Each structure stands twice: as C-alpha cells, then as structure tokens.
Amino acid sequence: MDENINELISDLKTHLEYLKGMGIVSLPASGMKADEPGQSTMITLEDVRKELGDCKRCKLHRGRKTIVFGEGNERATLMLIGEGPGYDEDVQGRPFVGKAGQLLTKILQSINLPREEVYIANIIKCRPPQNRNPEPDEIQSCTPFLMKQISVIQPKIICALGAFSAQTLLKTDVKITALRGKFYDLEGIKVIPTYHPAFLLRNPERKREVWEDMKKIAELLNNA
C-alpha cells in the first residue's frame, strides 16, 4: 500500500511540474467549473508570443539578433523541437533555415509532409554563443514558453531532434542512440527522439535510422 501511495505522489509531482511549465499555477476549486474549450480564456500562439515579448529573462538576450519563436501550423499533428537557433536562424528569426533546416524539409517531404503542415520550434529561442549547449538557467527561462506552445498546438506527436532536445523533454540523461526510434509519453503526447539534421550532415550514414524513425511517425499519423 505504501509503495502505491509513493508512486501516486511521484506521478502527481510530475504532473504538477508539467502544469507549472505551461504557466498554470492554480486550478479551479472544487465545485467550480473549469473553462470549456473554445472560450475566450483559451490562449493562442500569438498570446504566448506577446507574453514572451522582447525577452530578457536570461543572459542569451545580450548576444542575439532576433528571438526565434517557432513557426508552422497552429493545429499541427506533428511538432518538431530542436535545440536552439544557429547563425542563420538568429539572422532570419525563423527555425531551421540553414543547411540543417533544408535537410529537415527534405526529411519531411520523404513522408509526404509539407513543412507548412507541421510546427517547428526549439528548446530555447535565442542563439547561444558559439552554438554551445544551453545552460540550466537558460532552459528554465525558456521552457515555460515552449510548454505553452505545446499546450496550444496539442500535437499528436512530438519529434525531438537531437540529444539535447530529447533529454530535456523527457528529463533523462540517456544517450540519443538509446532513446531514438521509440515512443515516449509526455502528458498524453507521443514523443519520438531522432538524430538532429545537423548531426546527419556530419554523419550521413545515420540517415537510414532517421528514415526508419520518420516511417514510424508517418504510420502513427496515418492510423490516428
């Protein structure tokens, strides 16, 4: 019995952390009716963008040119999440527009998904210096806005591009080689990690594995 209670408490803590990440800090009291879908209190991506504003919540704002919020279909069934903006993305203010982005577009085309039909974002929205990995305080500042984006879009599948994205979303330090190709649960949304397109540019022999992962995504979307 104690073991079951401890497991329940652990699950509740995980769920509350997820809600906090989405910016939800309170829940309706007993007997009060929660907001119904479609009511005016439902937020949009534009609401999230306005809340983000000219963000200076962490030190990354000092060196950025633009905030890379994300782009795509607000009702996408597939959401792709990378690590952070690179040089080209920082200049243009759009995610995945460099060589890695061009490869990502081709990968999506391979499963008959136009880029315009998906939503693409990153764990963080400002380019880190020298494209280094984001630091914990930077992730903490940016993650609530990503979680709100996920909450608005409600995709059926999230494809985590690269080790950093997968490990951040799944809260694990397991290597991408072990994570990729499998589906995990994030509050009812299927998450499948795969290699980052930039990694594929350096290691083209791994493209076959990404192709296998994308086929799993296509199959799940087609059967939804």
Regions of interest found by a model, annotated:
Residues 10, 14-21, 25-224:
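A polyanion-binding, active-site-adjacent surface
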Residues 1-9:
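Short, small/acidic-rich helices and loops at N termini and domain boundaries
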